[in-house]
């Protein structure tokens, strides 16, 4: 007697998933074989039915299908809708396995014993699949399809009846290509064959026409419209029956697959094998990688000459040290201990030498207190501004310390290159007697100029800041002749207002100012030369400073003159020729035009600074 799944779990037909889970746990604890050691066989059978019932009812689709076909599954005989009409009976050779007959095998109680016996799981399911395969081949032959004559599925079903299921399976393994559908096999069937079986049967499709499902009898006496309507309804019934049959076969395949322990064990073994193969593959790859790396390193690495040890020389050294040590020690025990000690010491020294090979060289900058890993990094650091500033600061500090301690002669400051080396050579090559004679001549010239120009000395000494042309003449042998054709605006205004008398007074004052300034600048130049000669031994920086100041003065003077040349005159010059006369700065000769003065300067070589004439400062009386 078949048992309903709901009755087996003791739940209602509308029970929820949570209720089904609780009922399954309760029944499993009650009928599990481990909980019933006195009645293991019966407990195993009941527990298998409980597990099958829970697997069907826990799946929503399987549960819906079970509810709709529950009466057909629980009945011992297939339900035939044509039982009421005894006049029409369908031949079983035409229909084959029907949907109603297949429904009877959805009961898990039929598969309680998982063995190769006739009442076991493998033979019951295997015979059902063989019957379905036979029907498909017979329908293919009936329809005259190509290739179906070569299929041996019909013979396999006959071999089961004549030889038995196990022998039929063994004999058909050699001719699996002649079968339309793979066989189900038994307990020793391989996992690969099972995968092929379930793959093929999961895509099952039938060739049956299901004409026995027609609702109306077709007759030629019907008119065309009636015939068309009858054919339409009969085709609809056939399609519905065919679809139901295909779904039933696929569901039966899934039902058997859940109960098949071979698939579970085979999947587990396949997973373990796959992991083992993956592990072995990785190990082989690692081994090959290590071998390849070792081969590459061995091919690239060569011992240097200093890394190799001459064994003969090493043995000779050991013998020499052993002899020396034996001479020092008389006691034999001490000799043995010392002998071992020397050997160990030599070995440790040898190991330490090999360990020293792997030392890392670090490059330090002691000025900036930084470390570098390569010489190139240190060279790049030396070129940076930060290092140069720190180096200048350290040099200045060292110079100050040496000067404070009186260690100028001992300092290494002379090792550094100086920009004033040529100037130092010039002064060092001069004779002191020549210098004294030159100084006496300069003093005589200053005395004569002071006597001649003392009468014209006035209170305009405050306006002598920019008159440095005479210093240029004394300090440089090459004269820089500068000619300015422009007339200052202040001079133009003075000429227009004061007239000829004021212009003469202005020229006199300019000459006086230039003479006074020249005397002071001569004295300043003499004192500067003497001071530079005295300090040339202790410091060289003064020469560079003087040259820089000298070049800066020239640059500023050139810029001022350029700006004056670019500045346009605000008012035109309206002075008379008699009021403004050009005077030579050397011989004091007067000329009526500037061109005459320039020609005189070029022929006679009388060059004097024209800054006083250009600036045209006003006298205190006019102010």
Swiss-Prot record:
GO terms for cellular component: cytoplasm; nucleus. It is found in: Nucleus. Residues 553-564, 612-623 have a biased composition (Basic residues). InterPro entries: Chaperone_stress_response, DnaJ_domain, DnaJ_domain_CS, J_dom_sf, Znf_C2H2_jaz, Znf_C2H2_sf, Znf_C2H2_type, ZUO1-like_ZHD. Residues 453-466 have a biased composition (Acidic residues). Residues 4-70 form the J domain. Residues 525-538 have a biased composition (Basic and acidic residues). Disruption phenotype: Leads to fluconazole resistance and activates genes of the PDR1 regulon including CDR1, YBT1, YOR1, RSB1, RTA1, PDH1, and NCE103; as well as PDR1-independent adhesion-related genes such as EPA1, EPA2, and EPA3. Gene3D superfamilies: Classic Zinc Finger, DnaJ domain. A zinc finger (C2H2-type) spans 363-387. Keywords: Metal-binding, Nucleus, Zinc, Zinc-finger. Residues 499-508 have a biased composition (Polar residues). Residues 448-476, 499-581, 599-623 are annotated as: Disordered. It comes from the Eukaryota. Acts as a negative regulator of fluconazole resistance, primarily through down-regulation of the ABC transporter gene CDR1 via inactivation of the PDR1 transcriptional pathway. One of its GO terms (biological process) is negative regulation of response to drug. This is Negative regulator of PDR1-mediated fluconazole resistance JJJ1. One of its GO terms (molecular function) is zinc ion binding.
């Amino acid at each position: 007697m078949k048992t309903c799944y709901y009755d087996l779990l003791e739940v209602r037909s509308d029970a929820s998933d949570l209720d089904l889970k609780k009922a399954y746990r309760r029944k499993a604890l009650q009928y599990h074989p481990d909980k019933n050691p006195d009645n293991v066989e019966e407990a195993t059978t009941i527990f298998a039915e409980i597990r099958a019932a829970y697997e069907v009812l826990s799946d929503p689709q399987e549960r819906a299908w079970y509810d709709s076909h529950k009466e057909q599954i629980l009945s011992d005989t297939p339900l035939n809708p044509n039982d009421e009409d005894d006049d029409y009976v369908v031949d079983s050779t035409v229909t084959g396995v029907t949907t109603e007959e297949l429904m009877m095998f959805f009961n898990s109680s039929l598969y309680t014993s998982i063995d190769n016996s006739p009442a076991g799981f493998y033979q019951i399911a295997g015979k059902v699949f063989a019957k379905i395969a036979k029907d498909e081949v017979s329908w293919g032959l009936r329809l005259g399809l190509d290739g179906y004559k070569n299929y041996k599925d019909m013979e396999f079903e006959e071999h089961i009846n004549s030889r038995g299921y196990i022998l039929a399976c063994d004999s058909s393994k050699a001719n699996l290509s002649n079968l339309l559908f793979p066989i189900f096999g038994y307990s020793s069937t391989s996992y690969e064959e099972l995968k092929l079986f379930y793959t093929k049967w999961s895509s099952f499709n039938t060739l049956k026409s299901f004409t026995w499902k027609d609702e109306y009898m077709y007759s030629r006496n019907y008119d065309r419209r009636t015939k068309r309507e009858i054919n339409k309804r009969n085709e609809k019934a056939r399609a519905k029956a065919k679809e139901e049959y295909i779904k039933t076969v696929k569901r039966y395949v899934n039902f058997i697959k859940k109960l098949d322990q071979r698939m579970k064990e085979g999947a587990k073994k396949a997973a373990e094998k796959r992991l083992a193969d993956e592990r072995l593959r990785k190990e082989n790859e690692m081994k090959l990688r290590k071998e390849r790396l070792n081969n590459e390193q061995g091919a690239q690495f060569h011992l240097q000459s200093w890394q190799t040890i001459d064994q003969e020389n090493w043995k000779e050294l050991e013998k020499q040290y052993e002899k020396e040590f034996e001479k020092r020690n008389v006691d034999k025990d001490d000799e043995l201990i010392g002998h071992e000690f020397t050997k160990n010491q030599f070995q440790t020294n040898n190991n330490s030498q090999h360990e020293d090979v792997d030392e890392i060289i670090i490059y330090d900058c002691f000025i900036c207190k930084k470390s570098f890993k390569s010489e190139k990094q240190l060279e790049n650091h030396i070129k940076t501004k930060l290092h140069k500033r720190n180096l200048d600061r350290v040099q200045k500090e060292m110079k100050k310390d040496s000067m404070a301690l009186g260690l100028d002669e001992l300092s290494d400051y002379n090792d550094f290159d100086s920009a004033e080396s040529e100037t130092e050579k010039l002064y060092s090559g001069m004779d002191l007697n020549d210098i004294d004679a030159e100084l006496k001549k300069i003093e005589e010239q200053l005395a004569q100029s002071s006597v001649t120009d003392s009468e014209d000395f006035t209170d305009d000494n405050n306006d002598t800041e920019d008159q440095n042309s005479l210093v240029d003449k004394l300090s440089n042998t090459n004269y820089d002749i500068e000619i300015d054709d422009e007339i200052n605006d202040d001079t133009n205004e003075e000429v227009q207002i004061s007239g000829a008398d004021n212009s003469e007074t202005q020229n006199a004052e300019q000459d006086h100012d230039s003479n006074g300034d020249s005397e002071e600048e001569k004295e300043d130049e003499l004192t500067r030369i003497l001071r530079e000669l005295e300090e040339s031994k202790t410091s060289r920086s003064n020469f560079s400073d003087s040259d820089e100041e000298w070049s800066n003065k020239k640059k500023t003077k050139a810029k001022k003159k350029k700006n004056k040349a670019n500045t346009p005159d605000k008012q035109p010059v309206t002075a008379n020729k008699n009021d403004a006369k050009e005077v030579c700065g050397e011989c004091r000769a007067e000329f009526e035009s500037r061109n005459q003065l320039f020609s005189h300067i070029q022929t006679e070589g009388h060059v004097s600074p024209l800054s006083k004439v250009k600036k045209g400062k006003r006298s205190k009386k006019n102010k």
